[in-house]
């Protein structure tokens, strides 16, 4: 009788061990699968009348700058020789770094994936691995007779937003109104009678 009880205990212990191992493995796979994120862009601006306008047709390109490997950020091959440090994470430093990285991309003919905003001023980039991404508007966008452009910016996947770690990040870049070009006046030029 003792042997039967002992055998039952051993069988139960082995079953609990196997079930516990399965749960741990499932948790690891679920965590690994949740390390993909996205960036949604909502593009709006204020026109010359200070009215908010939705900017459809704005083209944005995304460039992977660094990726996560073994809990360490590694430079993407295209940008590893840029000489730009990303150590300073202040807002001012990030603005400067984004401008420098975009200039480096243009100088070295590095192209990113480009998307255009829809009629609601939205576009998104999905299936993004953990890392740092440069997002830049390509050219400017028109709304009526007004033109708008936004500065390039850096986005971390994941990002800490309001104390929460977010893998799906929504960005509203500051689209600046570009004053229309006025033809230069030439006072020396004679007018035809």
Indicate residue ranges for each PLM-predicted region.
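Solvent-exposed loop/turn and edge beta-strand elements of beta-rich ligand-binding domains
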Residues: 1-193
């Amino acid at each position: 009788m003792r042997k039967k009880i002992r055998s039952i205990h051993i069988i139960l212990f082995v079953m609990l061990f196997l079930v516990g191992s399965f749960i741990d493995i499932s948790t690891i796979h679920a965590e690994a699968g949740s390390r993909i994120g996205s960036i949604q862009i909502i593009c709006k601006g204020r026109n010359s009348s200070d009215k908010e306008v939705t900017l459809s047709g704005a083209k944005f390109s995304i460039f992977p700058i660094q990726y996560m490997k073994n809990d360490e950020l590694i430079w993407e091959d295209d940008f590893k020789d840029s000489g730009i440090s990303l150590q300073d994470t202040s807002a001012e430093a990030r603005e400067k770094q984004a401008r420098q990285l975009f200039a480096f991309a243009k100088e070295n003919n590095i192209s990113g994936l480009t998307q255009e905003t829809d009629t609601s001023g939205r576009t998104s980039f999905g299936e993004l691995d953990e890392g740092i991404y440069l997002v830049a508007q390509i050219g400017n966008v028109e709304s009526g007779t007004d033109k708008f452009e936004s500065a390039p910016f850096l986005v971390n996947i994941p990002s800490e937003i309001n104390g929460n770690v977010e893998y799906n990040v929504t960005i509203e870049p500051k689209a600046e109104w570009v004053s229309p070009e006025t033809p230069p006046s030439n006072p020396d030029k004679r007018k035809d009678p």
